Amino acid sequence: MVGFKATDVPPTATVKFLGAGTAACIADLITFPLDTAKVRLQIQGESQGPVRATASAQYRGVMGTILTMVRTEGPRSLYNGLVAGLQRQMSFASVRIGLYDSVKQFYTKGSEHASIGSRLLAGSTTGALAVAVAQPTDVVKVRFQAQARAGGGRRYQSTVNAYKTIAREEGFRGLWKGTSPNVARNAIVNCAELVTYDLIKDALLKANLMTDDLPCHFTSAFGAGFCTTVIASPVDVVKTRYMNSALGQYSSAGHCALTMLQKEGPRAFYKGFMPSFLRLGSWNVVMFVTYEQLKRALMAACTSREAPF
């Protein structure tokens, strides 16, 4: 047995809720530079936007983007928007991941045997609900990641300043910009990520290929990360472009997608695929492994407090 030993008592909804948010924050701290590189690659080629990289900066590949940013803007630029990112994960992941099992049980009416349909419904529900809660934090995170420190200066000086500036210049709706593509993206991501993780893990356990331990969690999380990236990349690129667009640049998320297709071709929808996969794959591994261990650790702590002797 590697890691914390599973307890006889299943984790409570509160443990899952807190564990998911904490695990997601840990994963973000480790993989945030890859996410920033992904955003820069995704917005490259846009004609305009409220914040954008310097005109001379051309990003090529994951490492090329990271090295260019470090050279032109300094190492700290890789963590632009980290505060908003952590705020997002505590509210976002807690809902979409922490409530997944509870919603799945609701759709299966308490049955232990969940069908793929009920898992997909649960993933869509918690993914969409999480967006409703955390959208402003996502907008601020993307804006921070998109802006360059070199050149014309930074538009947003702090996380609080970003919230205030967006609300003042673009109205309250500015903080909820891109909600539609984000709902679509996260319904898709949640279904692909959580359902795939569930299915791979169940298959490995049923076939007795692995035990419910770290290697099983690692393998399931990595597979889920790849499947999710392939499925969600197009809507993720549209979401990022639309969130970072200037007021009036696109009339809707659909208009943004159509403009991308006309001006840049279908390959534009997979811009930043490699950093997306590296980020999502590594993020999934860190998050799911940490989440599984946190659930066991928290339940062990609760059990020991209730029965100290």
Swiss-Prot record:
PANTHER family: MITOCHONDRIAL DICARBOXYLATE CARRIER-RELATED (PTHR45618). Inhibited by pyridoxal- 5'-phosphate, bathophenanthroline, tannic acid, bromocresol purple, butylmalonate and phenylsuccinate. Proton conductance is activated by cardiolipin and long-chain free fatty acids and inhibited by purine nucleotides ATP and ADP. Chloride ion transporter activity is inhibited by long-chain free fatty acids. It catalyses: L-aspartate(out) + phosphate(in) + H(+)(in) = L-aspartate(in) + phosphate(out) + H(+)(out); oxaloacetate(out) + phosphate(in) + H(+)(in) = oxaloacetate(in) + phosphate(out) + H(+)(out); (S)-malate(out) + phosphate(in) + H(+)(in) = (S)-malate(in) + phosphate(out) + H(+)(out); malonate(out) + phosphate(in) + H(+)(in) = malonate(in) + phosphate(out) + H(+)(out). Keywords: Membrane, Mitochondrion, Mitochondrion inner membrane, Repeat, Transmembrane, Transmembrane helix, Transport. The lineage of its organism: Eukaryota, Metazoa, Chordata, Craniata, Vertebrata. Residues 1-16, 104-119, 200-217, 295-309 are mitochondrial intermembrane. The GDP-binding domain is located within the hydrophilic cavity, with GDP phosphates likely forming salt bridges with the charged residues, Lys-141 and Arg-185. Widely expressed in adult human tissues, including tissues rich in macrophages. Most expressed in white adipose tissue and skeletal muscle. Disulfide bonds: none annotated. This is Dicarboxylate carrier SLC25A8. Residues 41-77, 146-173, 243-268 are mitochondrial matrix.
